[in-house]
């Protein structure tokens, strides 16, 4: 454990940020899983609805630096391709 006051403060702040980021990451993954579940069920309308809910959340997390912007783009591209295959 840190002895210096500023190091103790950073440890507290880092733990707080870690918990916040974990919560946001979990929420984002849940939205992504909802899209995959709709695709697996073969329901294009539900998949599109879930995708439209997921997209701004993934973009927001990428903008804030929680995930890389290329990872966000990859998720969106892969899911869009799978939804379009449902037809």
Swiss-Prot record:
GO BP: translation
GO cellular component terms listed in the entry, alphabetical order: cytosol; small ribosomal subunit
Any GO MF annotation of the entry: structural constituent of ribosome
Keyword rRNA-binding: yes
Annotated keywords: Ribonucleoprotein, Ribosomal protein, RNA-binding, rRNA-binding
Cited InterPro entries: Ribosomal_bS20, Ribosomal_bS20_sf
Record's keyword annotation contains Oxidoreductase: no
Protein name: Small ribosomal subunit protein bS20
Organism annotation: Salmonella typhimurium (strain LT2 / SGSC1412 / ATCC 700720)
